[in-house]
A protein has these predicted regions:
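Conserved hydrophobic/amphipathic alpha-helical signal-anchor segments
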Residues: 1-58, 62, 73-83
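Secondary-structure capping and boundary motifs in well-ordered enzyme cores
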Residues: 9-10, 60, 94-97, 199-201
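Alpha-helical scaffolds flanking conserved acidic
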Residues: 14, 98-100, 203
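Short, surface-exposed recognition loops and adjoining beta-strand edges that mediate ligand/DNA contacts
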Residues: 34-43, 55-58, 79-131
Length: 324
């Protein structure tokens, strides 16, 4: 398949995923959560044990991709899922390995096959102690917005609830268009269930989905496994492992936790040259496909203006994004 045909096929995939998000919203009056979790104030879960000691995330973990299965003709998989039970339940082990074609970009030179979940040391990992937790792959990811708010951060009150909904007041100074010390947000995050009325920048001006080739790191349609770590498959000056939320989510920057060698917050659009497991990454020549909240698909050149990309990644900051 030629590059142009692969790009068109990919655009069709991500368009169908975007339309499925809209169908989900019509059925439920909100978009699916980026992923579902039951964090608590003291870092404990009902058993009294913190599954993820950094983010305090717990079960069930199901991500946006798992929730739209009935809308992408994958109802046979969805019917076997208990969305209130953990991803890693024994009853789910075969289902979560499913290779679902719409989640796979034909341009990705990385694996299409399911992958083994790993921990910080890259050893096989599962919260229940099993070492064979294998997840179906996705080359498409949901937009978390500008910040990488998927764990307690310096300056927070260190309570798990702070990232359950739209984030609390910013603790770091980041400036875009003169707006200092803000935490920007996108439509997908822990327990988000964003209502369309909250996308005040407009669904036609807000990035919902993008690409992430498995050449860079492993992503899944299934969801988030608390305590897992996403590792890069090649290194760069800014690249390193990141938390389990990046199994399904990416962000645009700027994020106060990610600074370049000059100390300036990084914005990383599609194919940003230093790479990052929590960014959009495509193998199409020159850029990658993104899907906006209205289901429209756009090919973003990898040289897109950084501020424009960041502005399109937030859903309710009131920016007027530039040309793209």
């Amino acid at each position: 398949m030629r590059a142009a045909a692969r790009r068109v096929s990919c655009a069709n995939n991500i368009r169908q995923l975007g339309l499925s998000l809209l169908n989900y919203e019509s059925a439920h009056q909100h978009f699916p959560a980026g992923y579902s979790s039951t964090p608590t104030r003291d870092g404990s879960v009902p058993s009294g044990v913190a599954i993820d000691s950094v983010t305090w995330d717990s079960a069930p973990g199901w991500g946006w991709g798992a929730h739209i299965l009935p809308f992408i003709e994958a109802g046979n998989v969805a019917r076997g899922i208990d969305y209130d039970a953990p991803i890693w339940n024994a009853a789910h082990r075969d289902l979560i390995r499913a290779q679902i074609p719409i989640f796979l970009c034909p341009s990705s030179s990385g694996d299409n096959e399911p992958f083994v979940v790993v921990d910080e040391s890259e050893s096989p990992y599962s919260p229940d102690g099993n070492t064979d937790l294998i997840l179906g792959r996705s080359h498409y990811v949901a937009s978390h917005g500008q910040e990488s708010a998927w764990g307690p951060e310096a300056g927070s009150d260190m309570t798990g609830e702070i990232f359950t909904d739209i984030y609390t007041a910013a603790t770091r100074g980041v400036s875009i268009n003169g707006d200092v010390s803000r935490v920007a947000d996108g439509p997908f995050y822990r327990n988000s269930e964003t209502k369309i009325s909250r996308v005040t920048d407009g669904t036609s001006n807000t990035i919902f989905l993008g690409e992430h080739s498995s050449k860079l790191s492993d992503k899944t349609w299934v969801g988030v496994v608390p305590g897992a770590i996403v590792h890069p498959k090649f290194s760069s000056p800014e690249n390193g492992p990141d938390g389990a939320a990046t199994m399904v989510l990416v962000h645009a920057g700027p994020s106060g936790g990610e600074l370049d060698i000059t100390g300036f917050p990084i914005i990383h659009p599609v194919n940003f040259p230093t790479f990052h497991v929590g960014q959009m990454f495509s193998e199409h020549p020159g850029g990658g496909n993104v899907c906006f909240g209205d289901g429209s698909v756009h090919f973003f050149n990898e040289s897109i203006d950084l501020i424009t990309f960041a502005e399109l990644s937030s859903m309710n900051e009131g920016e007027v994004a530039g040309e793209y």
